[in-house]
């Protein structure tokens, strides 16, 4: 294995050298986390979608004959995620490694790996029957609990795969909240004010408009509780916007 290829196994180096994308330290810490179970409790506009796209592409390219599945809370979010991934691929050398026609729901690479991008739906019908090595949930707290627990989680049983759950918190009676409070998951707390692209003036205006309680959920991501104390917790950095 050449040194150049070994370097590309680092997702941050891959992002910079192949995707022409330089993650901020905020995103780099998450991308380099080797944990198989990761949960990110985040405010709006903190770079969730971009980080998910980078993770999916890097995993697919560096792990032949695997399936990476991105599940979005809505069809519209799924389409936006697909556009983000296709933009990354089409603007880089990776465009030559795509086999067949690029579609919004699935992309196959020359190494036999797939990236599939689908909405959760109300009953998970479009997800059933998929076995995955990597599952990335975008706005997990908005997905039906029965879909997360009965359809998505079982996809990883046969592969002992990786699962990331990223979301703005929406309620305590959800799998996302229980996962956040589980000792088995690596945790990250991403309040919106960490994003340098979001001005303090805007946040103060939002606080006045939507009220303190909603502001704490939407921008401080406090519904899951205070930020955890584990060493993997991100407390700073400069994320890209979604």
Residue ranges: model-predicted function:
Residues 1-242:
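Phosphate/NTP-binding elements of NTP-utilizing enzymes
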